[in-house]
Amino acid sequence: PSMRTPEYEQMAPEELRARVEAMMDERAKALPFVFLKLPSCVIGPQDEVVLPYDVEKPDWELELGVVIGKRAHRISPEEAMDHVAGFAVVNDVTARELIFRRDGSAIGADWLSGKSFPTFLPFGPMIVPKEQIADPYALNLKLSVNGKTYQDESTADMMVSIERQVAYLASRVVLEPGDLICTGSPYGNGSAFGVFLKPGDVMEGTITGLGTQRNPCVAEAR
């Protein structure tokens, strides 16, 4: 059978870049996609991440954490920062292959299974008050595994702003003091490289002005 050449292959680099930028702009305008991660996932910045024995593709996702300081419901993006207490380093560890059901269920993604294993949310080392962060959109996020850097990006490239994320969540639920919002991970997850966590690995994640976390990975006892 004849095969049609994909349209993007016929574009000049400038055209392709413009097309990709337009697609990303449209995606940024869409409603944020949100899931819940259980409090039982949270561990400290030096604690061990336990890799479940039945998970094949444990992955990392370094993110800027936003800690709520004042109750929020039905607020505007312009009001959102008034409800933020501070910022922290978070690593949204994920069982990558469990997100989408292997049985082909029409229900779709299984975020609980993929995200909420114990120890799957290294947090800290501290919560930095928002007043001490001059510009939350000028922070560098960097994550390495065994000394090799995989993520090295800026919050300037955040697709959905902190204000929009807080306001959107507050339009759906009541945000209470102490609630944590993980604002999304930049490029460089293990799945992008076909590299996944294994026992003995050490993740080191840092965000400008928020400190560094260093979490060794260990196998779950059977």
What are these regions (language model features)?
Residues P1-N146, E153, V160, V218:
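Active-site microenvironments in enzyme catalytic cores
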Residues P39-S40, T94, S185-Y187, G209:
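Acidic, glycine-rich active-site loops and adjacent beta-strand->loop/helix elements
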Residues F123, G178, I207:
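Residue-level signal for inorganic ion chemistry
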